[in-house]
Amino acid sequence: VEMFGADSSTDAKVMEFLPETNIVIGAAKAGVQVLSKKQLGEAKNLLVAADVNAVPPVGIEGVGIHDMGVELPETPQNAIGLGALAIGDIKYKLHLKLFEMMKSADEPLYVDHNCAFDVAREIVSKL
């Protein structure tokens, strides 16, 4: 997996990375739209668009703040959208479960990223 941050300040800069991107996470400051539906239409390899901006306008046009795996028909591969509050809900459930695990353990429990990821997968599988 290759992850990188990208400049999305202009349409031209977005189009330098978006057509080959599989997953995009919109993480601009509140109230800034990072990607439009028109741009998403050029994202030929996009599978997931996650937006962590819950302040209007949303960061990724077409992804609602409560969306959990909603199909984005404007994308060539019908990518799925994840909204900020849906992401936050999973994060909350994950934190709660990890705290419960720590509280019920007989000995100190140290949780690393791999453990947290496994627990998150378990939570998401039940949605």
Predicted feature descriptions by range:
Residues V55-L127:
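Adenosine-phosphate binding glycine-rich loop
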